[in-house]
Regions:
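Zn-dependent metallopeptidase/amidohydrolase metal-coordination segment
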Residues: 202, 226, 293, 305-309, ...
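Acidic-enriched catalytic cores of C-N bond-cleaving enzymes acting on peptides and small amides
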Residues: 212-293, 321-343
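Active-site metal-coordination/substrate-binding segment of hydrolases
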Residues: 79-147, 430
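Acidic/histidine-rich catalytic neighborhood of metal-dependent amide-processing enzymes
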Residues: 117-192, 447-448
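N-terminal helical capping/dimerization or prosegment-like subdomains
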Residues: 2-96, 308-312, 325
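A short beta-alpha structural unit
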Residues: 316-318, 345-360, 384-386
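Acidic, glycine-rich active-site loops and adjacent beta-strand->loop/helix elements
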Residues: 88-90, 146-154, 177-182, 205-207, ...
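Short, low-order "capping/linker" segments at domain edges
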Residues: 355-373
Length: 448
């Protein structure tokens, strides 16, 4: 099919693609513990039906975790096979009061579709479906569509699924549609992602809670103890202060501080922390954040000193760093700096490898050409991402000859993982066009 034919086909398919995306968004498929996992099952069934509708041999697979979907269509003679990855599970919606509308009832406002998963990553699923629908029975490559069901919860069973279905997943090109673009109107290839270590730190100072008036003063309550300990993780500039955590500088993309402040929603008067350029700080240097604290709610807090306090700490690792070494470094720092002789327990929740992709060669040239065409001549950016997709390292290890392309539908205003997550509908159509053109270009580049 010609480029103009593919563009026209995508345009024809978009109403149906959007309707199917909205149906997916209405399924609250959260893989976290404590949520109704029957919705994740429903989501997997819906995705499987979409892939079967594209003519793929499709199965739902699971190995101890939430269901994934694998759809396959054999390559024409001499043509390459492309693996198309996305995930159908979503983050919890959080407090509904923070959303302008129901998080699981998609609503369009000002050219954006709002709803949990509208961008991350059900639109990634539908970008794959849109490209396949555009080709119909003229698909020039083989495809394996792999849609995971627990990415947001750490992909615990993903390695097992990959190893159990290794030959089915083996491909020449891997497209991971779980990232985003540099800006509205500016496409991007993601070429580096930080690694991740999530851990817990719990301090204990008392056998049980005691009266804050009778004992307050000489007794170090657990919340203040924990607060002082967490404060040692950064210096006065907000730079990570843990020996052994290293990064590098020199990210090449200019990211003005005022744009970053706007996109992050930083309040007036609040300083940025750390040192170096914005891109260094979010792409190539480590960061440490406190994601939550176990403590009494203020409305329920009694006049009592708390015996224990616990924090969840998230460490993002610079590309090239080892998660185990990073965990050991942070644990050693906490153990060295725990105040007032408090008892401390540090435990690992999860970790994931960072990755760097050498985005050179004919497949990457084909991808950039597809992006350039879909965005009417705009040159794509090679960018880093501060977040993590740990299984990319697994793909790199198991399929070393495959070219890995990290793409996606998000833009700086998508608000993934937060309230009012949204998808720019105009950019979504460009993403669908780009993926169809990518498959066309890969076929022309690699068919023997």
């Amino acid at each position: 099919m010609s480029e103009s034919d593919l563009r026209a086909a995508i345009r024809r398919e978009m109403p149906g693609v959007r309707a199917d995306l909205e149906r997916l968004v209405r399924i609250p498929g959260v893989a976290f513990e404590g949520f109704d996992h029957s919705h994740v099952e429903r989501s997997a069934v819906a995705v499987a039906e979409l892939l079967r509708g594209c003519g793929l041999d499709t199965e739902i697979v699971r190995h101890g975790g939430q269901p994934a979907v694998i759809g396959r269509k054999a390559a024409p003679a001499g043509a390459p096979t492309v693996l198309l990855y996305a995930h159908h599970d979503v983050q919890p919606a959080g407090d509904p009061a923070l959303w302008t509308s129901d998080p699981f009832e998609p609503v369009e406002r000002d050219g954006r579709l709002y709803g949990r998963g509208a961008a991350d990553d059900k639109a990634g699923v539908m970008a794959h479906v849109a490209a396949l629908r555009a080709f119909g029975d003229q698909l020039p490559v083989g495809v394996v569509v792999f849609v995971e069901g627990e990415e947001e919860y750490g992909s615990d069973s993903l390695d097992t699924i990959i190893h159990e279905h290794l030959e089915e997943l083996r491909s020449d090109v891997i497209v991971i549609a779980d990232s985003g673009n540099w800006d509205i109107g500016r496409p991007a290839l993601t070429t580096s992602l930080r690694g991740l270590v999530n851990m817990f730190a719990e301090v204990r100072v008392l056998k049980s809670a005691v009266h804050s008036g009778m004992f307050g003063g000489p007794v170090p309550d657990a919340l203040i103890t924990l607060a002082r300990l967490l404060a040692t993780l950064h210096d006065d500039d907000g730079e990570v202060a843990v020996p052994g955590l290293v990064g590098r500088e020199g990210a090449s993309v200019d990211y003005p501080a005022d744009r970053f402040r706007h996109e992050a929603g930083i309040l007036d008067g609040v300083d940025l922390i750390g040192r170096g350029t914005i891109t260094d700080r979010i792409w190539t240097k480590p960061s440490i954040s406190v994601l939550g604290v176990d403590a009494p709610r203020t409305l329920e807090a009694a006049n009592a000193l708390q015996p224990t306090a616990k924090a969840k700490i998230s460490v993002r690792l610079a590309p090239g760093e080892d998660p185990k070494s990073a965990y050991d470094a942070v644990r050693a720092h906490l153990e060295k700096n725990v105040p007032w002789g408090a008892q401390l327990e540090v435990t690992l929740e999860s970790d994931g490898q960072p990755c760097v992709i050498d985005a050179t060669g004919p497949v990457y040239d084909a991808a950039r050409a597809a992006f350039r065409s879909a965005w009417d001549g705009t040159e794509p950016v090679d960018m880093g991402v501060g977040g993590s997709i740990p299984f990319i390292a697994t793909f790199q290890e198991l399929f070393p000859a495959a070219a890995i392309l990290v793409t996606g539908v998000e833009d700086p205003y998508s608000g993934a993982h937060g309230p009012d997550e949204s998808l720019h509908l105009g950019e979504f159509e460009r993403v669908c066009v780009a993926e169809a053109l990518l498959l066309k270009n890969v076929a022309e580049t690699m068919t023997r």
